[in-house]
Amino acid sequence: MVDWTDAERSAIVGLWGKISVDEIGPQALARLLIVSPWTQRHFSTFGNLSTPAAIMGNPAVAKHGKTVMHGLDRAVQNLDDIKNTYAALSVMHSEKLHVDPDNFRLLADCITVCVAAKLGPAVFNADTQEAFQKFLAVVVSALGRQYH
């Protein structure tokens, strides 16, 4: 279990309320696929991923990006039990999909970049970033749990 301070909880929940998951999700996943093209191998059923423009306009990428962000909403709602919240997803990504667990960290980085770009430094200040990155690190750890 993670020890969250009241300030961290407040920052995470407050920030989450300002995030448009249907906007950030597609942007973040598209950014991952563009910046880290080797991750595309896990999305072979998504159709055309040949160029940045194709990725940005790909409806399957957008849909899965939204799914990822809605999954993060579950973690925000279960801050005290993120590990168990993601137990089944960890098994699926490890045993069925064979996703390199480092890809979760790469996607978390892309989510952070997209949130920061959208909300700006007045909202996404250093304290908020610290709490949000801690939150994402806990999620990444929970998703990678099955790999250990």
UniProtKB/Swiss-Prot annotation:
Q: Which GO terms describe its biological process?
A: hydrogen peroxide catabolic process
Q: What tissues is it present in?
A: Red blood cells.
InterPro entries named in the record = Globin, Globin-like_sf, Globin/Proto, Hemoglobin_b, Hemoglobin_oxygen_transport
Which SUPFAM superfamilies does the protein's record reference? Globin-like (SSF46458)
Keywords, comma-separated and alphabetical = Heme, Iron, Metal-binding, Oxygen transport, Transport
Which Gene3D superfamilies does the UniProt record give?
Globins
Q: Where does heme b bind?
A: H64, H93
> Domain Globin: where?
3-148
What are its GO cellular component terms?
blood microparticle; haptoglobin-hemoglobin complex; hemoglobin complex
Q: Please, which domain of life does this record's source organism belong to?
A: Eukaryota
- GO MF annotation: an example: peroxidase activity
- What subunit structure does UniProt give? Heterotetramer of two alpha chains and two beta chains.
Record family assignment = Belongs to the globin family.
User: What does this protein do, in the record's words?
Assistant: Involved in oxygen transport from gills to the various peripheral tissues.
Q: What is this protein called?
A: Hemoglobin subunit beta
What organism does the record attribute this protein to? Oncorhynchus nerka (Sockeye salmon)
